[in-house]
Amino acid sequence: MPRALWTAWVWAVISAFTEGASDQASSLSCDPTGVCDGHSRSLNSIPSGLTAGVKSLDLSDNEITYVGNRDLQRCVNLKTLRLGANEIHTVEEDSFFHLRNLEYLDLSYNRLSNLSSSWFRSLYVLKFLNLLGNLYKTLGETSLFSHLPNLRTLKVGNSNSFTQIHEKDFTGLTFLEELEISAQNLQLYVPKSLKSIQNISHLILHLKQPVLLLDILIDIVSSLDYLELRDTNLHTFYFSEASISEINTSVKKLIFRNVQFTDESFVEVVKLFNYVSGILEVEFDDCTHDGIGDFTALTLNRIRYLGNVETLTIRKLHIPQFFLFYDLSSIYPLTGKVKRVTIENSKVFLVPCLLSQHLKSLEYLDLSENLMSEETLRNSACEHAWPFLQTLVLRQNRLKSLEKTGELLLTLKNLNNLDISKNNFLSMPETCQWPGKMKQLNLSSTRIHSLTQCLPQTLEILDVSNNNLDSFSLILPQLKELYISRNKLKTLPDASFLPVLSVMRISGNIINTFSKEQLDSFPQLKALEAGGNNFICSCDFLSFTQGQQALARVLVDWPDGYRCDAPSHVRGQRVQDARLSLSECHRAAVVSAVCCALFLLLLLTGVLCHRFHGLWYMKMMWAWLQAKRKPRKAPRRDLCYDAFVSYSEQDSYWVENLMVQELEHFNPPFKLCLHKRDFVPGKWIIDNIIDSIEKSRKTIFVLSENFVRSEWCKYELDFSHFRLFDENNDAAILILLEPIDKKAIPQRFCKLRKIMNTKTYLEWPTDETQQEAFWLNLRAAIRS
């Protein structure tokens, strides 16, 4: 019994393990190229069953704690491995030994407290390694990266426990495109630790305090192109001139991101620019200046200029004591060499005239997302301000008058590019004044409703996107590029107004269509972006767009940007894929064909009516409908005749000389209705026939070959036919005056033919001895 329990327990464990492994393997989604995605799947281990077909494996943001020697041994073609944001605390020595093709490895934000060089000894082609955010204090006892000759991007350190950088740490690395060191709590930096790296393109340094900053800078200043300092409090920073005076520097760009300054530390940083003479660009991003701009009493007067700095960028500068801040006049003399200045989203409402006049080399000025208005712009763009300025960006400020703005900028003689987008202009005056060299103007998102002659005729590039324009009728003879997307235009602009236009962006309007003739009217058009409009996919439009292969080279957003809005059955489809029916595209031909078919149908109907007496049927239907309006059966007192006699004119002798004599002169006499004597003059013949039949108890048909050929006999027979079979009575008496073939009776009198086949009719005897019996039978039939 215990043995059985033990066996059951073992099988349960094996089953659970197998099921778990299967579940984990199924949690990966892999495409045919070998890219497998398993991020954020709550995995607690690396899935089993991985093969050589896997080239990219993403297991980030899971709960993996351990990487074993066999977990990845079959992934010999793996190039990208992402294990970041897990709980990994252990990596076995040979875990990555078989990954000889690995180029990208991310182990960031795990729980690794120790790093081993054996992990990387076979990763000769590794280019990217991220070890940020783990728990280690140092980079190991031995040189960690000595086996990585092709490494180009390295990220190491953490924000808490990483405290020491030793000389051996970066041995073996000669060239890095990017090195990021997170060392907010750095306590020890051994000199020359970074000096072994001969060239670093971009160094990102996270330091909370600046104590060791100068030591690091001394080691890298001759091999570094681009230094980025993050999350640092520079309140206590002091620049020692002696320590760096002998160094040949190569740093070209310096960025301070989320860094705090004081008036004093800012001066120390400016000193640095004089000695690191290669710096061409300085950027302050999301920084805080804890001071009031009081530089006059400091050593700023010993600094003649900002080194060789040509580009100065300031974004989101916070000044807690903004309303106590000085006028900065003491730094004006330092700005003479600066060519490009960007001060963005920093609550700037004024550039003092004196500062503008000192910026003698300035070519580009960006004051986006600030508080500039026409009143302050008047002071900023004063006489002799920014003498060489070519580009001015005043996007998203507080400008309201286009006329005043243009007038205030007349002092800028060299200005050719002006961006005043996202200001609230609303309207445009009829005339304006602009600097004489204006070539580019950005008026996008200014809520203007129409364009006027206010725009300068010298423009080569105009952006009026995202406004309320419903037409474009300006003559701009030099305009080469027009950006007019997201407006309310219904058609392309007139090409005669824009003779040299080469680029037009007109997407997001309400244009229904455009034609080959319209595009051909722009002789120099090379790029057209017209997607996102409400295209009516007519036959002509589809034929044009789908039939012009060269059109794809002009339409930059073809084919995905072009969708049909109508007809409804192709709405939402790409114009390239839409198909219309033959009737929609060849309406005239279809209508002609239908008309021809209708004509043939009418012709055929006429032939059939003639052949099968269709006209007769219609006449009879009309007569029957007329007769239906009268009482179905005349009252007894309205019957005037014993019988109505229907006969052919050729048989009138027999009727008038024999029948009338035998019936009307008999005692008692019969009263007959004959059309010759009893029809009412002036009354329609058809009405006479109908009235006579209805006023007679019987209808006598004198049948002969002449009767069958007589048109009026047919009418009389027709209406009696309706009476007989609509009222279902036996009012008809047939007299066969001479033998006739029953087939000679028209097919349309089917019921009459049936009577002749089923009921007795009187036949006129040629033998005189039998004629008396004939008249006797006829009188009896009339009385019945």
Curated annotation (Swiss-Prot):
* Cytoplasmic face residues: 609-784
Q: Which residue ranges does the record assign to the LRRCT domain? A: 525-579
**Lineage: superkingdom:** Eukaryota
Q: Which residues lie on this side of the membrane: Extracellular?
A: 21-587
* Domain TIR: from-to ranges: 639-782
As recorded in Swiss-Prot or TrEMBL, the protein's gene is named TLR2
Which Pfam family, any one of them, does this sequence belong to? Answer: LRR_8
Motif ATG16L1-binding motif, residue range(s) on this chain: 761-778
Give the record's glycosylation annotations as residue positions: 114, 199, 248, 442
Keyword Transmembrane helix assigned: yes
- Residue numbers for the site described as Interaction with bacterial lipopeptide? 349
Q: What is this protein called?
A: Toll-like receptor 2
Subunit note? Interacts with LY96, TLR1 and TLR6 (via extracellular domain). TLR2 seems to exist in heterodimers with either TLR1 or TLR6 before stimulation by the ligand. The heterodimers form bigger oligomers in response to their corresponding ligands as well as further heterotypic associations with other receptors such as CD14 and/or CD36. Binds MYD88 (via TIR domain). Interacts with TICAM1. Interacts with CNPY3. Interacts with ATG16L1. Interacts with PPP1R11. Interacts with TIRAP.
Q: Which organism is it from?
A: Capra ibex (Ibex)
Q: Which GO terms describe its biological process?
A: cellular response to diacyl bacterial lipopeptide; cellular response to triacyl bacterial lipopeptide; inflammatory response; innate immune response; toll-like receptor signaling pathway
Question: Cross-link Glycyl lysine isopeptide (Lys-Gly) (interchain with G-Cter in ubiquitin): located at?
Answer: 754
- PROSITE patterns the record matches: LRR, TIR
Report the principal subcellular site. membrane
Give one GO term, molecular function aspect. Answer: transmembrane signaling receptor activity
Give the intrachain disulfide bonds: 30-36, 353-382, 432-454
